[in-house]
């Protein structure tokens, strides 16, 4: 109601009066705002899926997962359908909006019995309902993954090549982005504080943010402050090209905001990416794994053991042992550790990039990581 909106505005103003002064807070410069009509990014299919149909899809995914031999229980299946509208208006004259649909199906199941139980999952999301994988294929993948994890071994502490499955390798990019936001640089809490313009990854590595990718899960014509978005190579030929900044962090650093402001419905903007990916390499996944005499193929990461200040990296992991170029027995309860600077320089991407998530990478190999086991 109008009265409720008025009350919300009055409360916001009252809280703002009590907040400590921030010399860098404020709206984005008017001359940098997007003034043209937002381009069509093909992120709304104009449809919706009924609640009854969503129920059927969730059950189909769960049933397919439970039908896999060895699956003993289910944590459930889910299906979703939604439409979101993003509208932003500022007192500097910006007033634009865009809308998009999203669909998703997932399943999570348990294989085995007693202390030997293992859990795994599968999901798929898309902007268009017609692009969504079938619930049956998603459920089958979840069940197969869970059963493959049965009977894991532990490893002794050693140094091994580690290969990251694409569904977990995106965490490498998340660690990078967290270290190059304007706020991290302004607070001097980044292990890449002095890395702008330097070789952070091996030559040939490219990491690209594509806010205008058609049907992208995070595509957007303007950022959280009204600045136009644009494609950018964050890492180009292994070199860090610059920071990701909203208006406040740009003011603090004496630089220009980059169109990477991200925000929710409350709180100030921060900085983030849209559709982020690492470009594919030249080696096939089979060749990458085939050249490893003994290593670890990681399919799940556990915990958040990344020190943003030093770059020290230590996370729980599970996956499969690589022996003589083949995936063999499942592995669980190990910790993989190194430093992100060393990991970035040693990272080699395979040629199997597929755009499935908001952040996408091919299979990744990093040699010389410490595996801490039993």
Predicted segments with their positions:
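Active-site bordering "gate/hinge" segments
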Residues: 1-220, 224-227, 236-239, 326, ...
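Dual-mode signal for accessory low-complexity, basic/Gly-rich regions
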Residues: 195-374
């Amino acid at each position: 109601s109008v009265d409720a909106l008025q009350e919300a505005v009055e409360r916001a103003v009252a809280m703002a009066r009590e907040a400590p002064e921030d010399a860098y807070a404020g709206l984005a410069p008017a001359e940098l705002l997007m003034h043209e009509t937002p381009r069509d990014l093909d992120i709304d299919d104009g449809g919706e899926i009924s609640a009854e149909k969503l129920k059927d899809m969730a059950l189909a995914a769960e049933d397919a997962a439970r039908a896999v031999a060895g699956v003993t229980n289910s944590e459930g299946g889910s299906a979703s359908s939604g439409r979101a509208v993003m509208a932003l208006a500022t007192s500097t004259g910006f007033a634009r909006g865009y809308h998009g649909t999203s669909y998703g199906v997932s399943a999570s199941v348990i294989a085995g019995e007693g202390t030997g139980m293992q859990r795994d999952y599968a999901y798929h999301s898309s902007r268009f309902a017609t692009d969504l994988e079938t619930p049956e294929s998603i459920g089958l993948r979840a069940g197969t993954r869970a059963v493959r994890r049965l009977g894991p071994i532990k490893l002794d502490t050693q140094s091994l090549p580690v290969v990251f499955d694409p569904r977990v390798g995106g965490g490498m990019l998340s660690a990078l982005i967290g270290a190059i936001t304007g706020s991290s640089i302004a607070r001097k809490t980044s292990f890449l504080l002095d890395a702008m313009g330097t070789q952070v990854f091996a030559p040939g590595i490219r990491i690209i943010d594509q806010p205008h990718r058609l049907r992208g899960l995070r595509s957007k014509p303007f950022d959280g402050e009204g600045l136009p978005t644009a494609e950018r190579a964050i890492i180009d030929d292994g070199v860090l090209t610059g920071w990701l900044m909203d208006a406040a962090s740009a003011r603090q650093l004496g630089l220009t905001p980059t169109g990477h402001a991200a925000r929710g419905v409350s709180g100030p903007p921060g900085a983030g990416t849209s559709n982020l990916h690492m470009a594919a390499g030249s080696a096939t996944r089979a060749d990458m794994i085939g050249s490893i005499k003994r290593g670890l193929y990681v399919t799940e990461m556990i915990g958040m053991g990344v020190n943003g200040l030093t770059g020290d990296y230590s996370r729980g992991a599970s996956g499969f042992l690589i022996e003589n170029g083949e995936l063999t027995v499942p592995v669980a309860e190990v910790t993989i550790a190194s430093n992100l600077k060393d990991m970035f320089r040693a990272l080699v991407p395979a040629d199997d990039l597929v755009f499935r998530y908001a952040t996408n990478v091919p299979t990744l190999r990093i040699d010389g990581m410490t595996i801490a086991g039993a």
